[in-house]
Amino acid sequence: MLDLHLIRTQPELVRQAFARRGQDSAPLEALLRADERRRELLQEVETLRAERNRVSEEIGKLKKSGGDVPRPEGRDGGPQGLATAEMVAEMRRVGDRIKELEQILRAVEAEQERLALEIPNIPDASTPVGTTEEENVIVREWGEPRKFDFEPKPHWEIAVNLDIVDFERAAKIAGANFEVFKGAGALLRRALINFMLDLHTREHGYTEAAPPVLARRDSLIASGHLPKFEEDQFHVRENDMFLIPTAESALANLHRDEILEAETLPLTYVAYTPCFRYEKFSAGKESRGLIRQFQFDKVEMFKFVTPETSMHELESLLGNAERVYQLLGIPYKLALLCAGEMSVAAAKAYDPMAWFPGTGKWMELSSCSNCLDWQARRANVRFRRERGAKPEFVHTLNGSGLAVGRTFAAIIENYQQEDGSVTVPEVLRGYMGGASKIGDQGCEYVIVREDTAGSRPKCDT
């Protein structure tokens, strides 16, 4: 949510934000009209209240004196004397008009609040102009795509052939766009989750959180996933709860309605959760297999920071996500997203795009965003710089660290072998009992040794 004062005083800046995102500014224009109408109504109500208070005072004096009190000359064109009963009747009419206007005012304020939720964040000056993926800017690349001496297969073929992911039996349980991880596949999935959580907590200093996967409507409004994307959510109608589309929805509300102390910032959290999105997508390589599912696993990073540090913290968050790609040996291109490709909450965002040799595509396993104070205003998360100082809104940042199913798919495609097996990345072997390869008989193991007491098992190769 943007500051209403900013919208009111700098509407052209907000219009430009809509234009940069390739969106119609109709919600802004409607909001400005509603704001003007609200202020007109407030002024009329206050004028009538003042009139009512003044005349009520006159009536009090009149009753106390037992007679009439002078009426201001020329008011309503009437005579100078006004009987008490007539004055009381007039005030009843004024009171009725105030009630009528207050009802209209409440409706206008509700409409203003609804429209304010449709205003996206203002893109940062460094965010490229554009509305399509082709207009994103590649800022750097890491790793060399592997050269195969055979035709690489897409992950869904490899996984089914190895019997480590079962789409058909998942469909028996829940319908299309679900999967069952089995055997070595379930082990690899769990290894990825534990590896990512360990990396972000032990090396990057995040605090692990395990939030609910159900959230109230106001929580998803605060994170920005409602109202725009309500059709994409799994909704429990009986109690108006939603299955979270990402842990960001929960973590953004962790300090809702709190005033934090500056010395506690930044607050950094990481959470693994299943995520649920009822996305509608067309058939194609970018939606097959594990790429777009109604339920998927994700490790999410989230930060509450001071405004002056948020852009630096975005680069740090991005580096934490890139570290996962690098340790797993997955080549990627880093895209700085153009304005039209960002979420409504983001002012600046990066997508590290992993190479999928079997699919023949670069696809993101993560998206890292700086939302400035847009989410914090919705969630009312503030901080004080010092004792007695006026509270300010924090800035919030989020990033996948990473999406587990997509990372699983990227590993399967990048580490596939000609015989149909998949080599396990070295960094994951200690999480898989020392397994170095997934073949058609499951995991193949190597000798595991403990180098030092208390260390994570390492694998001989």
Predicted regions and their residues:
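TRNA-recognition modules of translation machinery and tRNA-sensing kinases, especially anticodon-binding
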Residues: 141-452, 457-459
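Low-complexity, intrinsically disordered short segments enriched for Gly/Pro and polybasic residues
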Residues: 70-72, 82, 452-461
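N-terminal alpha-helical targeting/anchoring segments
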Residues: 1-146, 164
